[in-house]
UniProtKB/Swiss-Prot annotation:
Binding partners and assembly: Associates with pre-60S ribosomal particles.
Zn finger (C2H2-type) start-end: 61-85
Keywords: Cytoplasm, DNA-binding, Metal-binding, Nucleus, Ribosome biogenesis, Transcription, Transcription regulation, Zinc, Zinc-finger
Protein family according to the UniProt entry: Belongs to the ZNF593/BUD20 C2H2-type zinc-finger protein family.
UniProt feature, compositional bias: Basic residues: 1-25
Source species: Homo sapiens
Described purpose of this protein according to its UniProt entry: Involved in pre-60S ribosomal particles maturation by promoting the nuclear export of the 60S ribosome. Negatively modulates the DNA binding activity of Oct-2 and therefore its transcriptional regulatory activity.
Biased composition (Basic and acidic residues): 26-36
Protein name as it appears in the record: Zinc finger protein 593
Length: 134
């Protein structure tokens, strides 16, 4: 038995890091900012939404809570019943970490437990389908 060469093994770590960065999704505080009712950046369902060929389903069916795009409304509704979506809604129900909470943790105040926020179960930017039954 001879000695085997392991060429190219040192590149696997950097490739894994690149793929991890590519699949990175927005953090919870960024999603909270989008879901805020008074936030001007909150996307609303737009019947005249522009079709984006780079996104699944043209970017028309999106779950805001999970920051994912879906091919059609059927897959989006199936996603609403999935374990991943329910887990993300549970994470979003806790108030995001703030500077005041960081100061209290450092001993500059008394502990106040984080508030529970009401998150709608079906958060999406789904565009209503056109009715062609005439």
């Amino acid at each position: 038995m001879g000695r085997s060469r392991r060429t190219g093994a040192h590149r696997a770590h950097s490739l894994a890091r690149q793929m991890k960065a590519k699949r990175r999704r927005p953090d919870l505080d960024e999603i909270h900012r989008e879901l805020r009712p008074q936030g001007s950046a909150r996307p609303q369902p737009d019947p005249n939404a522009e079709f984006d060929p780079d996104l699944p389903g043209g970017g028309l069916h999106r779950c805001l809570a999970c920051a994912r795009y879906f091919i059609d409304s059927t897959n989006l509704k199936t996603h609403f019943r999935s374990k991943d979506h329910k887990k993300r809604l549970k994470q979003l129900s806790v108030e995001p970490y703030s500077q005041e909470e960081a100061e209290r943790a450092a001993g500059m105040g008394s502990y106040v437990p984080p508030r529970r926020l009401a998150v709608p179960t079906e958060v999406s930017t789904e565009v209503p389908e056109m009715d062609t039954s005439t």
